[in-house]
């Protein structure tokens, strides 16, 4: 089932999401719906707050990106970045902030502790695009959006567009949730 994407200015995007204590069939169904919704919106990452749920769950699927065509969707639960290395700037966008793209400086490599779709604990290292997308989605779990990381002059450039989105002037090819709907029960 395709779920509507929560848009900029909705309060759930500004909250620190709650950890999951386990996973059951309802979470498995949710994960499938998140993957379907992300693909429908032509995204490569989606965090639970982006569908109105305050839970520490995210999905990454780089397969639409050239060079990553064989990538499988990755489920990340309760992530915690243990270490970072190097920094670089790269253009980012976000399904919750349609039509805005800007360069964001982030660590180029991370060591991540998380639980997978079977709720098994893992510690892995990620670099390049995967590290960037994971950090972007983890930020969603912490109530941070990529526009919060922009330098002042870049933020000024997109401010009017952000105000338009907050006012509901949004045009997307995917369904969006009503703004300020609040978090749904997890």
Swiss-Prot record:
Enzyme class at the top of the EC tree: hydrolase
A single GO BP: co-translational protein modification
Annotated GO MF terms: metal ion binding; peptide deformylase activity
Chain sites annotated for binding Fe cation: 94, 136, 140
Family classification: Belongs to the polypeptide deformylase family.
Organism: Prosthecochloris aestuarii (strain DSM 271 / SK 413)
Name of the protein described by the UniProt record: Peptide deformylase
Segment forming the signal sequence: none
A matching Pfam family: Pep_deformylase
Catalytic activity: N-terminal N-formyl-L-methionyl-[peptide] + H2O = N-terminal L-methionyl-[peptide] + formate
Disulfide topology: none
Lineage, highest ranks first: Bacteria, Pseudomonadati, Chlorobiota, Chlorobiia, Chlorobiales
Cofactor (UniProt): Fe(2+)
């Amino acid at each position: 089932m395709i779920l509507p994407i929560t848009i900029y200015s909705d309060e759930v995007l500004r909250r620190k999401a709650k950890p999951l204590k386990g996973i059951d069939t309802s979470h498995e169904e949710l994960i499938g719906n998140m993957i379907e919704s992300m693909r429908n919106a032509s995204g490569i990452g989606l965090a639970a707050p982006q569908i109105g749920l305050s839970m520490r769950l995210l999905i990454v699927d780089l397969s639409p990106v050239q060079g990553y065509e064989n990538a499988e969707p990755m489920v990340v639960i309760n992530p915690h970045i243990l270490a970072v290395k190097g920094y670089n700037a790269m253009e980012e966008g976000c399904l919750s902030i349609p039509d805005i793209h800007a360069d964001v400086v982030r660590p180029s490599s991370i060591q991540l502790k998380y639980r997978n779709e079977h709720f098994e604990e893992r510690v892995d290292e990620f670099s390049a695009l995967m590290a960037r997308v994971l950090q972007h989605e983890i930020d969603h779990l912490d109530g941070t959006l990529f526009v919060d990381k922009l330098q002042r002059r870049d933020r000024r450039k997109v401010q009017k567009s952000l105000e338009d989105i907050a006012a509901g002037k949004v045009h997307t090819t995917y369904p969006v949730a009503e703004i300020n709907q609040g978090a749904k029960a997890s």
